[in-house]
Amino acid sequence: MIALLSALSDGKKHFYTDLCQELSVTKQQLAEDLQQLDQQGIEICCEADGCYWLAAAELLDRAFLTKNLPHQQLLIQPVIDSTNQYLLNNLSKLSNNSVCLAEYQFAGRGRRGRQWLSPFAGQVIMSYYRIFSTNCDISGLSLAVGMAVAQALTELNLHSVQLKWPNDIWLNGKKLGGILIEMKHNPHLAQNQVVIGLGLNVNLPKKIVVDQPITMVSEQQNINRNLLIVKLTQHLAQALTLFEQQGLSAFIPKWRQYDAFYQKKVKLLLENQSIIGIEQGINAKGELLLNTEDNQQLSFSIGEISLRLISDES
């Protein structure tokens, strides 16, 4: 199935017999692969003469992206296991601020090892590579990244953009996307090599099934996906430079603007207990601040923690 998707990802029409020959499969095997793609929510068009092509109308535009992001090393992989993993596997070949983009990833992962859903050409699937000195405290980096994403979306006239600590992007109270940050330490160069993964729903197929309320950009605005990638990348680059110079403290005032749960009653689900209180934003380390029911102010670092609105429990 993956080989077939790779072959079709050029956006061109392909004859059935040519696909069989190119992929070295039988007609029956090709039919089964086409059925699997359909079950994954990937729409394939066909004509009576036996031509097949992907229904996705808006594919990644290498020329447009290269022209508008001249300072980034762009690595466009139509079909890939994981954009984060691709960068992590190729650190020695990357320049600072490299960006990996994909139409579809079949082994994408989210926070705490969860699989990241990835319909073909329906999302922004990107990973951003940045080198930080070991002197730079990268605590709370995902929060700074979230604010960069929120500002990019707001600039494109999306309304009700919010952030849920520590790494979710919300739109109209539903999940729009998520952030996953992974790092490798290079002691010889005194560097932290950081890979920032971002997945953002743009235009999802109707048949997609998920276990939580989600939304997509197209429910508010018809924004060109390539333009969206450009804006996200530009805001990310600016935010990462500011973060490197001033740390997370430079972002705290803006965090309150986007914090979905600020001054609201929430429940924190820890490994062995739950704590109820009023969410009070974040501190300079990126820790969540909570005023508990017995008037304690507690702070919680990013880890095995889930945050819920009390109203979600009803």
Regions of interest found by a model, annotated:
Residues A3, D10, T17, N96, ...:
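Catalytic beta-strand/loop module used to bind and position nucleotide/cofactor moieties
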Residues I2-T154:
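N-terminal lobe of the biotin/lipoate ligase/transferase fold
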